[in-house]
Amino acid sequence: MNLDFIKDRIVAVPDFPKPGIVFRDITPLLADPQGLKMTAKAMAEELKSKGIKPTIIAGTESRGFIFGVALAEALGLGFVPVRKPGKLPRETYKVSYQLEYGSDSLEIHKDAFKPTDKVLVVDDLLATGGTAKATVQLIEKTQASVVGLIFVIELEDLNGRKVLEGHNVSALVKY
């Protein structure tokens, strides 16, 4: 698939949220009637080309929900949300991770996956890899296996892929 359709709908916004940062805005991609469908199709093709066959999709709050559900629908699979703390009503696993300034946490229900599940992690952006690594750690607490991670965008100069060494990582658009 030609990824120009996707790349052309990601807008570079200089100096947001602070000077020196170039924010990659996906809202035009989502606003396009074909944007989400084409992104899910491109993700599905990437998985097929690598021989990755998940049994379930996990998406990280919040934009991972958007792309994760679209991909799950395209593949005929279920979807599990990976949430910020305090959003899930039943017993959870929790993993904390470091941000540039401070820390954050993610949670999933303890029974979100079966030990036989082959989980694909979906999110919009791979930057430093902290959120993705925490997501992998959460899934591994359930005894399920992570078969890959896929992102719409990868910011290569932030080396997030290095943090995920040993995992199958894909990104549709790289900057």
What are these regions (language model features)?
Residues 2, 8, 134-175:
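PRPP-dependent phosphoribosyltransferase catalytic core
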Residues 74, 96-100, 164-168:
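Short, hinge-like loop/turn segments at secondary-structure boundaries
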Residues 55, 117, 147:
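Conserved acidic residues
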Residues 80-120:
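Short, glycine/charge-rich flexible loops or terminal/linker lids adjacent to PRPP-binding catalytic cores
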Residues 124, 129:
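Conserved G/P- and acidic residue-centered "switch" motifs that form tight phosphate/ATP-binding loops
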Residues 1-53:
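Active-site-facing substrate-recognition patch
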Residues 66-75, 136:
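Short Gly/Thr/Asp-enriched flexible loops that form oxyanion-binding sites at enzyme active sites
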Residues 52-61:
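Short glycine-rich phosphate-binding loop at a beta-alpha junction
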